[in-house]
Amino acid sequence: MNHENYSDAYLRAILTDAMTIAIVGASPRRERPSHRAMAYLQRRGYRAIPVNPNAAGDTILGETCYASLADVPEPIDMVDIFRRSQLAGPAVDAAIAAGAKVVWMQLDVRDDAAAARAEARGVKVVMNRCPAIEIPRLRLPPLSAAR
């Protein structure tokens, strides 16, 4: 797949099919982009599950934070990665192992080798994009209204 440009249809399908999103690198600090994105996704009707070993066991925006994707006790539709590109590969591999249908790497996060591994396993991949930007750009309704 060409990861330079994604069709609106591809992004729309991902963002309307996913209901449970694990946020790798979620932060309890309000000023952090991962915290703001998680709050936005919750407001839009997604179940956002924080994953951060430094905050494991804590509550972030009303959700228990897990140390790893393997610790999340429910199915994950999409994994949203807030890690530097150099650290994205292990998160992608963990997403594959967890059975996620989609791996989404945030703005300025790109790992082509990890993307290829995911796609070889049938996992959809988005890199260098933010759902909190794409949802309003695509004019997607909140999940509860869309279903």
Label for each model-derived stretch:
Residues 29-32, 39-59:
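NAD(P)-binding Rossmann-fold cofactor-contacting core
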Residues 77-78, 102:
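Structural motif
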Residues 74, 111-135:
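Short acidic, glycine/proline-enriched helix-loop-strand junctions
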Residues 1-7, 58-74, 80-89:
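Glycine-rich, highly charged phosphate/nucleotide-binding loops
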